[in-house]
Amino acid sequence: MTLLAAFLAAVPLAPPAQGASAQPPSPQASVRPTEPKTVAECLRAAQTYAGRRMQELRAAGQTFNWAKLSEEATDLAKQYAARFAIATVATADLTPLARLYVLAKQPGLAEQAIAKHLATPGISDAEKADALVAAVDISMGSPVSDEAVKQAEAYATRLDAVKDAGRQQIQAHSHLGGYYRGVDVDDKIFEHGNKVIALGRGLTPDDKRATATMLAGAYTNVAEVYGGWEQADKAIGILEQGVKDLESAPQAKRQIEPTLERYRLVGTVAAPIEAPRWLNAPAGTMKIDPKGTVTLVEFTAHWCTWCRRTYPSIVRLHNTWAPKGLQVIFATELYGFLGQQRALTPGQEIEGDKKYFLEEHALPFKIAIEGRRVATGPDGSTPPSTGNGDHYKVGGIPQIVVIDRQGRIRLIIVGSDPASEARLNKLVERLLAEPTT
């Protein structure tokens, strides 16, 4: 997860489809229709450079290298930042300059600019709020340390005391909530998510639309905590409330609905896991129906760091409960790459999967491998999955699903919270003790 994204991107940018590559022309080529002069203009130009350049190359039918475009954007930010000095810019320009320094990968200067702005006597509440939310974002820049998180929390507390700063407070708590979601600290996800939800209820319809992505993220984050606590009814309730609260922001509803659909699966009959290729399964296996066996399914991928962190606990779970009837299945798919290897054939990637899952991680349970989804959209997008991930409404991985002997879904967990191991052990023990009929 890129924790600095919400801070840096005035317009959200997505990396290109896997495999796109080329050496793009110089930044001076065609992406500067007018030369920016003010700090704000330079910040905007640097923030939007990579996305605008990507669009130009696509329109020209050319491929591109996103990492290279990002490097060019950093170089451009450095050029712009060098035009200004903390000692001489107007007070109102200090926070935008700090943001420009972050884009230029000069965090020390960014901190100096923010510190000067916050120390300026008589600044307005609006300026103070902007400076404090920027301070949160700068503190949470990569790499994130425990001390930096404490500092960001302190800035957010100061920001909470500023009047008429709802949008900035939402941004700060969204950033912190996103960080805790990434490292799966449930109590903190819950705390910051609920703060954002409460703040959102006081916004005007226009402000709700402007902060829709952050507001929807708060509802989904809180719901996923409830889901991991075996409280799917509360997860559904908070998501339905989110749809109602954000009715003036249709894009938020679209963001919430997939998570709502996922938790509505709890209590329903689980779909079979199907794949043309399996590891650790008898030859000819094409489908496994979980009905009749207590089953844990994890959706995973060889590139997923957070998935990898679940493997030791899932192996321990398997070793403890498989002799008593637990079935564990991993579900993944082909991606056309593995590690630094690119443009792999299905056969090559499957061999790589064997080494990764069976040798490197010594996973003893069955692993379903679906085929690769191929990009078909004009923008390089892939079509929605119609396989296992679609049946289980997978949005992010790892996603763990626990199914009882009657084939009903009893739990859905998204993420890799270390506390999940104890909860999963208790649930599996309880399900194995339930009557078989």
Predicted features and spans:
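Flexible helix-coil transition and linker loops at the boundaries of alpha-helical arrays
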Residues: 32-33, 76-90, 118-128, 157-167, ...
